[in-house]
Swiss-Prot record:
Belongs to the class I-like SAM-binding methyltransferase superfamily. MenG/UbiE family. GO terms for biological process: aerobic respiration; menaquinone biosynthetic process; methylation. Coiled coil: none annotated. InterPro entries: SAM-dependent_MTases_sf, UbiE/COQ5_MeTrFase, UbiE/COQ5_MeTrFase_CS. This is Ubiquinone/menaquinone biosynthesis C-methyltransferase UbiE. Keywords: Menaquinone biosynthesis, Methyltransferase, S-adenosyl-L-methionine, Transferase, Ubiquinone biosynthesis. Its EC number is 2.1.1.163, 2.1.1.201. It comes from the Bacteria. The keyword Transmembrane helix does not apply. The gene is ubiE. Residues 1-21 are annotated as: Disordered. It comes from Pseudomonas putida (strain W619). Pathway: Quinol/quinone metabolism; menaquinone biosynthesis; menaquinol from 1,4-dihydroxy-2-naphthoate: step 2/2; Cofactor biosynthesis; ubiquinone biosynthesis. S-adenosyl-L-methionine binds at T79, D100, D128, A129. Residues 1-12 have a biased composition (Basic and acidic residues).
């Protein structure tokens, strides 16, 4: 009887890479990963993508439709790549909020943008994507780049993003996805599980964080599943664009 009650009240589990962990532990484990890699995050992005991440982000910005005077929220904004570009687009009459749940990443982003002198219209907020601390109908555009796969309850996060958008506002999700052909998929698997942890070891002295990165990509919903999640959350006109043979996809949805 006691064993049955324990089972009934057992904490739900989720994935951390390929591991099955209690939900309460995932956020802590993800935080440890980003505390470890924050200082060399930009360098590793360039090394692992061959600089392609800059092109993926540029296309995302083009799709965003952000213009002067807009209010933009960049979730999991990390070291500030998107925030810096949005800052220039919205100008002095607009606002950019760079939000990240990880204080190490937020500090790196704040220091980097202040050093570049582009933080005048940027606010830095430590925030959980599942429980965004912003008013309803507040932002013209919300973006999250390479962050959604680390969120425990993705459906809750997407609904939270919908809530803070103004009617007609846009959500853009840039994330690793599923390659669209078998040859690319096999090559990408070999690259991910051999080179990525090795590069992590050599550059950051941390192979495990980059093994988690490779595993977390495989556990993330594919393009059509993520599209359906956005529709279920309440977004209209949801579309996605594959880049680099589907290794990365950017999804866009509009708040009705």
């Amino acid at each position: 009887m006691n064993d049955q009650r324990k089972g009934e009240h057992a904490e739900p589990t989720t994935h951390f890479g390929y591991q099955d962990v209690p939900e309460s532990q995932k956020a802590k484990k993800v935080a440890e990963v980003f505390h470890s890699v924050a200082a060399k995050y930009d360098l590793m992005n360039d090394v692992l993508s061959g600089g392609m991440h800059r092109l993926w982000k540029r296309f995302t910005i083009e799709l965003s439709g952000v213009r002067s005077g807009n209010r933009v929220l960049d979730i999991a904004g990390g070291t500030g790549d998107l925030a810096a570009k949005f800052s220039r687009l919205v100008g002095p009459t607009g606002q950019v909020v760079l939000a990240d749940i990880n204080d190490s990443m937020l500090k790196v982003g704040r220091d980097r943008l202040l050093d570049r002198g582009v933080a005048g219209n940027i606010e830095f907020v430590q925030a959980d994507a599942e429980k965004l601390p912003f008013p309803d109908n507040h932002f013209d555009c919300v973006t999250i780049a390479f962050g959604l796969r680390n969120v425990t309850h993705k459906d809750e996060a997407i609904r939270s993003m919908l809530r803070v958008l103004k009617p007609g506002g846009r959500l853009l999700i840039l994330e690793f996805s599923k390659p669209t052909n078998k040859l690319m998929s096999k090559a990408y698997d070999a690259y991910s599980f051999a080179f990525m942890p090795l590069a992590g070891k050599l550059i950051t002295n941390d192979s495990e964080s980059y093994r988690y990165l490779a595993e977390s990509i495989r556990m993330h919903p594919d393009q059509e599943t993520l599209k359906a999640m956005m529709v279920d959350a309440g977004f209209d006109r949801v579309t996605y664009h594959n880049m680099t043979s589907g290794i990365v996809a950017v999804h866009r949805g509009i708040k009705p």
